[in-house]
């Protein structure tokens, strides 16, 4: 064996030897020297000095010996030589004697060593790591344990390294046209298991450590690499297993001249310099590492038919369409470089902060199809790999679709105000709905707000950190207000369409001819839903004014997509009669009806798009959800309406949620905004109330008009509108009674449940929390309770709308009573509705003690229904009637429950105000009575509903 081959067997006591070499040497030593080797730095230095003294002789004697014999001779030689370096015990000084005794006594005790490197998860969580692969912490919490983080060195690079890097960059640029440009020097570097200093990856002539290959190869990987390279030197070919494992890097890939990747406005970066991908084959000892699930196959020359440039990190939404691929898709499945953490420091061509997962390009996801519980998450997995584990992502998707009731669908998350999508379409194991990564990230973000997963609760700061990263990822993938086409979907005249009448519109979505692709049309609807998720959570926080930016973007994009209009009906051959029967979950033709050839009417020319019946219903439900929130927020923030009734007068009303989730698409439905209660979901009982509220908002805006308001308030037209709105409220009240009668009849409901249980046609949407209710009787009782709860909520909001119809929205104007409204008949009628609303609130607390049924919507109606009670308590004090006192007590209890469920500042503030007023009603007048009244006015003055007031938006 040549001298060069001996370089792969470092000396046992070399400070640069691997841990495997140290362990092999230690086993051949005596116990005393074993202790010295492990615990004495002094002995290690002495042995190193002896090795340097006899280094030349050892190299000569070892030539020609087998590897095992060389190891034995080497160990024995150093054992004898090292013993000669120690003095007789009688000649040692007392300090050395004491140290030797301590070392001998501690030989049996375990030696604690400080690990050189923690795994990426433990480093991110600041958790103690044992340095194993996988480590104990990741095994306990089911995390992906990897060591992909780059090793950093303090200080700047030396001039010698910079010069070598510049020379290497020049050499790489010269040899960029050679597909197989690896030389013998590069092979020698591969044999050594590392890259030589003159071959370090460079960018623009400077060394960039972000692409350096990690040096922490384990022992088995080093041994296999060494043996493979020795065989290559002897027989001039690699063993089969060495070829499949890619050797030591990507230098040997036949890329047919495409190893230089060029992007617009970006310097070229050769593919061989992407040596950070080399870390993938070094972690095959970890079954959870990405390389353990890579499909090894032979790389063919050339690139795929898709875009073959690295995605712009500032446009992460484009990564879901075009991926960086190696090999041909027709012959080989694309390799999945998954779970790869982004580099800790951005390279020179990546002007972004790190380590945001949205900045890292995503890759193909085929290898996760056998292990991922919900394949719908494939598009977002590369972006969340460094944020949450896959198992938690699947659990969060379950949380998003979890229902709090087993009888009727009711979202458990307070931030899911209504179901827009079908649960079965998302969670289908083989053919899920095609979603944009931004929508999936927003769903995970919404679910993470309330999930009880240990990953989000320990430590206490984990939820905030994860939610912040998911929020940044969602916004990065959504690209707010920039909804241009993804690479590969751009039409030839897209650049020309981006300039209209001399105005460069850029990527702000004005030219919509890119909707010619089905994925773009679906992606546009997904973007609206993503805006809804962002706006909902922000509206429920203390930053209510900031939420209007997201709501405005959602309303504008929905109007641009014409979601308020019905698409042309199905063609006769779109859905044969033979496909109408069967199980909706098993019959994929029923779950995904045949596409409809329709015209979207966007852009300069109409584009043909395939629209399924399920996608049509998603468009309807998304519009009606935005329609309801527009009216709700108009009351909350004292603003005019954005979406008009005229825009959706021909749009079909939403389906019943139970039928929608079961996939039974109804054929006959009414069109236009509803005014009657039809179901248990938000679309059934709350949407009609919002239709009526929109008319009240328009009436109030006309009353408060700065120039025409006074004349309108005294006109007959105003009185006619008030009477018409009151009539619609009476119609809703009657429909609410009929709804309660229809769903609370025990015999009818019990028979229906029994029949459904026998024929197995009951919709399968039972939540995990409600699966214990297995008998028909328990489902009947739960359905009755759920119906009564819906009726109580509907009754309360209906009474509040009667109060709002009177026009007294502002609490300060009520307390001032400048127009003596408190002595009018209108006040008496409104006061009766205030007491009725308090009684309905008492029923709500009976059926829903924590007010978790609709916490996002309920707060403002509870507040507006309480202003008249506050006025009565403030004016009458101890002379208030018992019904008013009970109503005040109920309102205080309801506000306390709201604070627990969805904690907001205005609810905490008004709870204190009502408690102070209730104490006065009961006769407990404080000494500083006038001061407390003034303090109440100051608090209420923060929330104004006057002409220039902003309501709850502080």
Swiss-Prot record:
GO biological process terms on file: DNA-templated transcription; positive regulation of DNA-templated transcription; xylan catabolic process
Q: What is this protein called?
A: Xylanolytic transcriptional activator xlnR
Q: Where is this region: Disordered?
A: 1-39, 51-93, 173-226, 312-332, 566-607, 758-777
Similarity annotation? Belongs to the xlnR/xlr1 family.
Lineage runs: Eukaryota, Fungi, Dikarya, Ascomycota, Pezizomycotina
Record feature DNA-binding region, as residue ranges: 119-145
| Cited PANTHER family | XYLANOLYTIC TRANSCRIPTIONAL ACTIVATOR XLNR-RELATED
Give the record's GO CC terms. Answer: nucleus
What are the protein's GO molecular function terms?
DNA binding; DNA-binding transcription factor activity, RNA polymerase II-specific; zinc ion binding
User: Ranges of Low complexity compositional bias?
Assistant: 8-21
Q: Which domain of life is it from?
A: Eukaryota
Protein's cellular compartments = Nucleus
Task: Write out the biased-composition intervals (Basic and acidic residues).
Answer: 64-78, 574-590
Q: Which portions of the chain have biased composition (kind: Polar residues)?
A: 22-33, 82-91, 174-183, 764-777
* SMART domains with a match to the protein in the record: Fungal_trans, GAL4
Its main subcellular localisation, reduced to a broad class, is nucleus
- Which InterPro entries does its entry note? Transcription_factor_dom_fun, XlnR/Xlr1, Zn2-C6_fun-type_DNA-bd_sf, Zn2Cys6_DnaBD
Fetch the Pfam families from UniProt.
Fungal_trans, Zn_clus
Q: Write out the function statement from the record.
A: Transcriptional activator of the xylanolytic system. Involved in the regulation of extracellular cellulolytic and xylanolytic genes and in the regulation of the intracellular activities of D-xylose catabolic genes in the pentose catabolic pathway (PCP) in response to the presence of D-xylose.
């Amino acid at each position: 064996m040549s001298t060069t081959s001996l370089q792969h067997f470092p000396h046992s006591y070399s400070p640069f030897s691997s841990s495997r070499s140290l362990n092999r040497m230690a086993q051949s030593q005596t116990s005393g020297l074993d202790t010295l080797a492990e615990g004495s730095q002094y002995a290690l230095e002495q042995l190193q000095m002896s090795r340097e003294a006899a280094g030349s002789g050892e190299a000569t004697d070892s030539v020609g010996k087998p590897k095992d014999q060389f190891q034995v001779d080497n160990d024995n030689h150093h054992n004898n030589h090292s013993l000669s370096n120690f003095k007789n015990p009688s000649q040692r000084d007392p300090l050395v004697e004491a140290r030797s005794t301590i070392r001998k006594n501690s030989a049996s005790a375990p030696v604690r060593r400080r690990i050189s490197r923690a795994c990426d998860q433990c480093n991110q969580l600041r958790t103690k790591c044992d340095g194993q692969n996988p480590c104990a912490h990741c095994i306990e919490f089911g995390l992906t344990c990897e060591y992909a983080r780059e090793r950093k060195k303090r200080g700047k690079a030396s001039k010698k390294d910079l010069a070598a890097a510049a020379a290497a960059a020049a050499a790489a640029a010269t040899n960029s046209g050679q597909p197989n440009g690896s030389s013998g020097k590069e092979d020698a570097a591969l044999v050594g298991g590392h890259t030589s200093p003159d071959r370090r990856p460079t960018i623009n002539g400077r060394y960039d450590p972000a692409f350096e290959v990690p040096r922490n190869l384990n022992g088995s990987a080093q041994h296999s690499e060494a043996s493979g390279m020795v065989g290559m030197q002897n027989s001039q070919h690699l063993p089969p297993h060495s070829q499949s494992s890619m050797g030591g890097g990507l230098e040997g890939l036949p890329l047919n001249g495409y190893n230089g990747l060029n992007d617009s406005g970006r310097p070229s970066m050769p593919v061989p310099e992407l040596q950070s991908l080399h870390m993938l084959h070094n972690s095959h000892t970890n079954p959870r590492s990405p390389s353990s699930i890579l499909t090894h196959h032979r790389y063919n020359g050339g690139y795929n038919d898709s875009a073959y440039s690295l995605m712009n990190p500032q446009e992460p939404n484009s990564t879901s369409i075009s991926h960086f691929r190696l090999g041909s898709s027709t012959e080989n499945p694309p390799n999945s470089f998954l779970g790869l953490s982004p580099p800790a420091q951005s390279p020179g061509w990546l002007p972004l902060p790190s380590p945001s997962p949205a900045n890292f390009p995503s890759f193909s996801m085929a290898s996760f199809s056998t292990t991922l519980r919900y394949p719908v998450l494939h598009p977002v997995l590369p972006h969340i790999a460094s944020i949450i584990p896959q198992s938690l992502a699947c659990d969060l998707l379950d949380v998003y679709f979890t229902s709090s009731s087993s009888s009727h669908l009711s979202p458990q998350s307070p931030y899911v105000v209504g179901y827009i999508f079908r649960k079965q379409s998302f969670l289908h194991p083989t053919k899920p709905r095609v979603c944009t990564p931004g929508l999936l990230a927003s769903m995970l973000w919404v679910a993470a707000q309330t999930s009880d997963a240990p990953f989000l609760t320990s430590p206490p700061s984990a939820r905030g950190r994860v939610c912040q990263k998911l929020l940044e990822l969602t916004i990065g993938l959504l690209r707010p207000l920039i909804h241009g086409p993804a690479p590969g979907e751009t039409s030839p005249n897209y650049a020309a369409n981006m300039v209209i009448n001399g105005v460069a519109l850029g990527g702000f979505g004005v030219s919509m001819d890119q909707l010619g692709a089905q994925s773009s049309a679906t992606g546009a609807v997904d973007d609206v839903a993503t805006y809804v998720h962002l706006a909902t959570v922000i509206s429920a926080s203390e930053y209510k004014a900031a939420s209007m930016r997201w709501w405005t973007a959602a309303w504008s994009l929905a109007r641009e997509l014409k979601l308020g209009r019905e698409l042309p009906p199905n063609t006769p051959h779109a859905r044969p009669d033979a496909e109408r029967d069967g199980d909706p979950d098993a019959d994929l033709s029923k779950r995904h009806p045949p596409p409809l050839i329709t015209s979207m009417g966007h852009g300069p020319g109409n584009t043909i798009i395939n629209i399924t019946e399920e996608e049509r219903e998603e468009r309807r439900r998304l519009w009606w959800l935005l329609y309801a929130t527009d009216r709700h927020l108009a009351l909350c923030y004292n603003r005019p309406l954005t979406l008009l009734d005229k825009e959706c007068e021909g749009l079909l009303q939403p389906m019943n949620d139970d039928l929608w989730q079961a996939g039974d698409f109804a054929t006959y439905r009414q069109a236009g905004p509803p005014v009657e209660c039809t179901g248990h979901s938000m679309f059934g009982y709350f949407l009609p109330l919002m239709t009526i509220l929109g008319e009240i908002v328009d009436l109030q805006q006309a009353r408060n008009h700065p120039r025409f308001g006074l004349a309108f308030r005294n006109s007959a037209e105003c009185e006619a509108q008030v009477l018409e709105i009151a009539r619609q409220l009476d119609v809703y009240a009657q429909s609410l009674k009929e709804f309660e009668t229809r769903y609370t009849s025990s015999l009818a409901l019990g028979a229906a449940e029994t029949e459904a249980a026998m024929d197995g046609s009951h919709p399968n949407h039972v939540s995990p929390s409600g699966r214990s209710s297995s008998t028909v009787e328990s489902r009947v009782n739960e359905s009755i309770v759920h119906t009564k709860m819906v009726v109580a909520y509907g009754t309360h909001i209906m009474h509040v709308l009667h109060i709002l119809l009177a026009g007294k929205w502002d609490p300060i104007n009520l307390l001032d009573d400048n127009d003596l409204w408190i002595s009018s008949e209108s006040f008496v009628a409104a006061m009766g509705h205030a007491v009725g609303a308090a009684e309905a609130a008492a029923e709500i607390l009976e059926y829903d003690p924590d007010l978790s049924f609709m916490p996002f919507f309920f707060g403002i109606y509870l507040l507006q229904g309480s202003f008249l009670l506050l006025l009565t308590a403030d004016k009458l004090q101890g002379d208030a009637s018992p019904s008013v006192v009970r109503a005040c007590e109920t309102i205080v209890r309801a506000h306390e429950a709201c604070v627990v469920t969805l904690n907001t500042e205005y609810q905490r503030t008004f709870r204190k105000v009502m408690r102070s007023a209730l104490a006065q009603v009961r006769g407990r007048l404080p000494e500083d009575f006038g001061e407390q009244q003034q303090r109440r006015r100051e608090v209420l003055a923060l929330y104004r509903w006057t002409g220039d007031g902003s309501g709850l938006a502080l």
